[in-house]
């Protein structure tokens, strides 16, 4: 998957990310990956479900990857942050 088909989900409203996914698909992408970590995970799930249920019902969830990243804080401590990557795909025609 090309790097431009990856959408990093953060603190913006869900509709911004829905629009980004729709733009990727309308420009010819077969797959779009939503990547989020920490508190943004629920927002990434909301985006995927909104796309599937309201905007593009033909889109399927192809893959879901979950994991943990080790991040070093400014104080030098190491914390673990949960991550998710949801791959949405148009069905093959």
Swiss-Prot record:
Q: Which UniProt keywords apply?
A: Chromosome, Cytoplasm, DNA condensation, DNA-binding
Q: MF terms per GO, please?
A: double-stranded DNA binding; RNA binding
The subcellular localization recorded is: Cytoplasm; Chromosome
Name of the molecule in the record: DNA/RNA-binding protein Alba 2
- The membrane-spanning stretches of this chain are none
The record's function comment reads: Binds double-stranded DNA tightly but without sequence specificity. Involved in DNA compaction.
For this protein, the record's Gene3D superfamilies field holds: Alba-like domain
**Into which family does the record put it?**
Belongs to the histone-like Alba family.
For the keyword Transmembrane, the answer is no
Cellular compartments per GO CC: chromosome; cytoplasm
One Gene Ontology biological process: chromosome condensation
């Amino acid at each position: 998957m090309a790097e431009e088909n990856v959408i990093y989900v953060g603190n913006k409203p869900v509709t911004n990310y829905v629009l980004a996914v729709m733009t990727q698909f309308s420009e010819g992408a077969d797959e779009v990956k939503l990547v989020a970590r920490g508190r943004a995970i629920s927002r990434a799930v909301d985006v995927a479900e909104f796309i599937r249920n309201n905007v593009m019902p033909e889109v399927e969830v192809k893959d879901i990857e979950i994991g943990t990243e080790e991040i070093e804080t400014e104080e030098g401590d190491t914390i673990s942050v949960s991550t998710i990557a949801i791959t949405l795909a148009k069905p093959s025609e």
